Amino acid sequence: MKLKHLLVAVAVMAAPLAHVGDASCVMAQLIKPKAKKAKTTAVADDSKYLMKGAVPVVDGQVRFSETVAAPGQTKDALFATLKDAVQKQIIEGPDHLEKARLTEVDAAEGLIVASVEEYLYFKRKAWSMDRVRFTYQLILTAKDGSYSVEMRRLQYQYDDVPNAEVLYAEDWITDEEALTDGGKKLAKKAGKFRRGTIDRKDAVFATLRQATNK
């Protein structure tokens, strides 16, 4: 047999073995256990709650405020819009309580004052709930082309705790009371009041801005 033919014969005989080897490799890959993905734990971003001055204290009282431009809108138009928004979306909001009401309305001055009482939820799940009665005063003043709003007199009270005391924002959510570790962390209990209050303030102010954004 010529050498050339011998080499061809050897190659033909080796081919099936090569295929078997390939198949074994493929099977090994198919049954190779998948690497487990590392579990990731979501970390809450507390940056806005840790900002110094996020809870303003004016003359010893916690007072959130802002002035919003509303170009082209008259005082009367803004007054009517704000009054409607406060009544329907805040006083009659989904978590409102029985004492929430308008306490002063003066169209000539563009003044709206509301005493708000509502539930503030720290946790709301089917099997676990943590909430307080949250009361505060809203003062709005409309002018031609702008309005101002202030939230003050903030108080909290657990209504599912017998003889629960009234908690004042000044004693719970200020930088001094709610921040620890040199301002790098929220205090365990006071921190949840600070977080919840800032979130609710942001929601109330956003509601008013959206109502007047025409």
Regions found by a protein language model. Name each.
Residues M1-I31:
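Bacterial Sec-dependent N-terminal signal peptides
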Residues C25-K214:
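Ser/Thr-rich, low-complexity intrinsically disordered terminal regions
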